[in-house]
Amino acid sequence: MSATPSLWNGKGLSIVCIPFTSFTPDGLEVRLDGVAAQAEFCVAAGNDVALLQGTTGEWPSLSLQERIDLAKEWRRCIPLGHAMKLILHIGHDALVDAITLARIAAVRRNAPDWPALAHRGAPPVLTPAMVVPP
């Protein structure tokens, strides 16, 4: 069976790491000090991609600032020049916050791109621009 070339590495199937977010024992604060060990593990295991805050279900529990801090810490912890791509989950109930996260996702550091995954866990938001005829 031949693998379809991956969007990420162009050679074959990518290995995607879906890390959990570490919290303090009381569950009230995010622990950024665990990100470096997670990133090191994912890199050493040969992962091509890390999907942040997207699939393990913790994103609705995080404040906007916590999500930004986590994204920046992950980006900081991937070794400069390493090929691992990061996908940032940008879904949010507030449109302005989703835009803020999308802007964070657009910042590039050690890879040609930092894709953003948009996902909404709540009903869609309608803005006046969407319902007022041109």
Give a label for each model feature.
Residues S2-P134:
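Active-site beta->alpha loop and helix N-cap motifs at the rims of alpha/beta catalytic domains
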